[in-house]
């Protein structure tokens, strides 16, 4: 077995382990009070509900966010950088696209994103492994 085969086997094993851990996490999380589960598999918890308008797919949104894995490992945080992020809503992972269209401006929600609405079976950076379930706290500041 060559190095490429070894790395492929390692990625497959990690993807399987991440998928199983995420499925268990989401099943348990769905039972928690205040957690809403959508047909897509997306789950969310409202930390604060804003009262402004909601963005659509064609808007550019400005948000603060803090992203972790289910074990609490932080992989990205505009909060830690002290700089909100702006991006087209159509250019982010499916879980964000779905959730943010439900959020009024001024809202802060915790999102629980299964792999099929996140990065799927791709390795992203050094922290997000294949089939990772992602957790984000997202505050919708504005949109244009």
Predicted regions, residues:
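Cross-family detector of peptidyl-prolyl cis-trans isomerase
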Residues: 1-144
